[in-house]
Amino acid sequence: MAQAGPTPQQAIARLRAEIEQHNIRYYVHDDPSVPDAEYDALMRDLQALEAEHPELVTPDSPTQRVGAAPLAEFGSVRHAVPMLSLGNAFDEEDVRAFDKRVADTLRGAGLLGLDQQVEYFCELKLDGLAISLRYEEGRLAQAATRGDGQTGEDVTANIRTIKGVPLRLHGAPRVLEVRGEVLMNRAEFERLNRTQAARGEKVFVNPRNAAAGSLRQLDPRITAQRPLRFFAYSWGEVHGLPEGMPTRFDEPAPGVRVASTLPRDTHGGMLDWLAELGLPVNLRHNHRERGADGLLAFYERIGKLRADLPYDIDGVVYKVDALPSQRVLGFVARAPRFALAHKFPAEEAVTQLLGIEVQVGRTGAITPVARLAPVFVGGVTVTNATLHNEDEIRRKDVRIGDTVIVRRAGDVIPEVVGPVLEKRPADAREFVMLTACPICGSAIERPESEAIARCTGGLFCAAQRKQTLLHAAGRKALDIEGLGEKLIDQLVDADRVKSLADIYSLTAFELAALERMGKKSAENLVAAIDQARRPALGRLLFALGIRHVGETTARDVARHFGSMERIMDASEEALLAVPDVGGVVAGSIRRFFAEPHNREIVEQLTQQGVHPQAEAEPEGTSLAGKTFVLTGTMPNWTRDEATRRILAAGGKVSGSVSKKTAYLVTGEDAGSKLTKAQELGVPVLDEDGLKALLGL
């Protein structure tokens, strides 16, 4: 009797297992085991069988990566274990200081001998989007972005479309949360941009931007078409190890044994274990090193390889390898004490300076901008770069037609470093500052002793008007949600809005007719404008955009005078009576309100029903008059929230540390302000310390 063939269920299980193994060979080991055509044939066979037997289709089948129906919006996901960021190092001194802190702490805990060096696990710092994958009973249950570290966006449907992300793990704990990076290889990025351009669609500025934009598509079918990759580099919640796996014990201190929920006792060992489960782990360039010298050698070695890697990195990461030692070192603010990101310096490139144009800012500041032949630097294609001001152009001797060195300062703002003089052409031309504004034709003047030239057109100048309106609508001023740059451009270009007061006369009907504005958006914007008719007096004063008058100064002046009328009529002597207001600020306020047009705008605001509310007097506390400086990112409060609470308690907030500073409040990436505070003996608080000082 002939032996019966496999049942449909058995055939489907065999095909799935075979495809999963090929995926592991390809994405985890970077070692394809079959040609693409054979892999595609297996997928077609599986798709055909599942089409014949739809009752056998399960969510973890390789065929289910094609993408689900579009979403209306992303849901929120609360991370069971916060996704922390890392402290940064930018030079050798930072790395040596980190290694010393770690070694001193571990020696104090009896985990490191006096003649021993700390062993670190060194990894590449991938330049993509941080993601958390949650597996339950071995199946991918949820995927979320990092978000603010506490709460991210649910991108499960999109993550499922990435072929390198296993939908099922064999031998995994009951719950396993995997952290990693979604990115796009440079070659795939360039191919995607060519396709986008051929279709007349938006091109992306760099691989990270492309990866983030692809992952955050509301339609997973679009994400499925994008060449995304995933690499695991850490873990979050882990519990319920598989049966048969022995319990491992850690020794966080001599003579102390603690049962661990993890199967390995080193960071590198855990990454090996994740790879054994079938997760893609970027192990090729990872390495163990001892002490600061070893870390710096790794940094130098990877720096030389950086340009040859298929993907972008922006540094390397050092982690104490022993997990018991990590536990002893613990955390500070939003970063672990046992890990450090060592950033690469800003990248430089050479290109041609095609021309110099000027931009007009909110206060009329004229900024020269270099127009460049496109050049890829610091991870993006750069065509414009700042030249700061006329004096800088003269100092650097930059001329139109020069071959110039371009640097992405801080990896954000491109700047021209200087010319390559040996390549200067004979017809290179010196820059001549304009005498009239290119936008409104008003005279350009450069006040004595200032480096910045300015357009004298004021709000007559459309460029200044746009920037002034954008400033006024901002969160620290009138906080008009929905009134952004593109909308302001349309309103000013159409001559519908000539001053701040005109904003308050906008109707939902006319707003709905604008580009990218529907009826609902228009109604929401009108509602936001209505809410801004009773702002705090300080906010309205700040919204007017008076030069040298910042948020804190505006609030102090408002609190001192109590009404806009009294501020407008105040003499320079009266303004100087406001604490911390000097001659420059007092003179600027007087000149602003001496201009009839500016007083007219305030009157028009009143006619539109804008009635500022007096600033509340601060509660009488011991903080009255004390100056605080904020630096870094706090775990829970934004800088605006911390500022608001300090001001409400009668304190002041400054942007720089001095002998007059009462407290420095630090968060993640505190930087040079912390160093200066320590030099001056200024007390340093973290967020909890600030809350305690405020009695919260």
From Swiss-Prot:
Report the residue ranges that make up the BRCT domain in this protein.
618-696
- UniProtKB keywords: DNA damage, DNA repair, DNA replication, Ligase, Magnesium, Manganese, Metal-binding, NAD, Zinc
Q: Which PANTHER family match?
A: CHROMOSOME TRANSMISSION FIDELITY FACTOR 18, DNA LIGASE
**Which cofactor is recorded for it?**
Mg(2+); Mn(2+)
- Quote the protein name from its UniProt record: DNA ligase
User: Which InterPro entries is this protein grouped with?
Assistant: BRCT_dom (IPR001357), BRCT_dom_sf (IPR036420), DisA/LigA_HHH (IPR041663), DNA_ligase (IPR001679), DNA_ligase_AS (IPR018239), DNA_ligase_CS (IPR033136), DNAligase_adenylation (IPR013839), DNAligase_N (IPR013840)
Gene name as annotated: ligA
Name the chemical reaction catalysed here.
Answer: NAD(+) + (deoxyribonucleotide)n-3'-hydroxyl + 5'-phospho-(deoxyribonucleotide)m = (deoxyribonucleotide)n+m + AMP + beta-nicotinamide D-nucleotide
Q: Which residues form the active site?
A: 125
Set out the biological process GO terms recorded for this chain's protein: DNA repair; DNA replication
Superkingdom, according to UniProt?
Bacteria
Q: Which GO terms describe its molecular function?
A: DNA binding; DNA ligase (NAD+) activity; metal ion binding
Among NCBIfam families, the record links this protein to:
dnlj (TIGR00575), PRK07956.1 (NF005932)
Q: What is its EC number?
A: 6.5.1.2
Q: Which CDD domains match?
A: BRCT_DNA_ligase_like, LIGANc
